[in-house]
Each structure stands twice: as structure tokens, then as C-alpha cells.
Amino acid sequence: MDFVFLIKNNLFDKGKISLGKFDSDEEYEELSKMTPIEIDRTLDINWAANIELPDYESTFISLVTETLIDTSILFMSEKIWKPIVAGHPFIVLGNVNTISYLKEQGYKTFDRWIDESYDLEPDHHKKLIWL
């Protein structure tokens, strides 16, 4: 997710944001100057395999930002599987037809509550604005 987009659109403080390690201490310092920030877990551990249920229990929906967004392939990382395992509603900023593929594989999504037409948008930036 583009943190600058979140900050410019006043979305940074609207929920919980998870991210990996910063590339440098300077990046962390810059981010901490821009907004109140709370780090509730160490960034020295790879949390890819962990599912933190309290995070899902304290939020209404997950915005999943996939690692690789490419129009030529369908890529799904652990990021999409975490809310699925937790039974948590989600929107995915990923490749075209990610939701469609999940449905084809038998997964149920939250289409009764979420307009999933964004899944058909091939332009990453248009999809980000829609979301």
C-alpha cells in the first residue's frame, strides 16, 4: 500500500496498518513525524506465518494489499489467506480476478455486503481510488 496515498487522503489513522521492516531508521523517523504511531509488535520477527486474531476481532474489514500486483499472472501470498482463515471480511488490492479465482476454488466471500466489481479493474491506480 502506498503510505503517501493513505496520508494524503486522511486514511492513515482509520484503522490498523501492518507492515514489514523499514528499510532504514530514517524511514521510520519520517513516518513517525507525520502521524501518531503505535507499534504493538516488534519488526524484527517475520509475522508472515502468524494470524493475530485480536487484530481481526477489533476491526470490521481488512484491506489486503498483495505483494505482487501484475496483470499477467495471479499472485496470492499469505496476506490474502489470513483474513480467510480468520473468517474476516476483506477487500483485496491485488491482481484482476483474485476474488473470482477464490470463488472458483469454492471459497465464500462477502459479496452480500461488499461490491466486488473492483476485482475486475485491471488498472492498479483506479482500483486503489475505488477502494
Regions picked out by a protein language model, each given a short descriptive name:
Residues 1-64, 70-77, 81-131:
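Pol beta-like nucleotidyltransferase catalytic core
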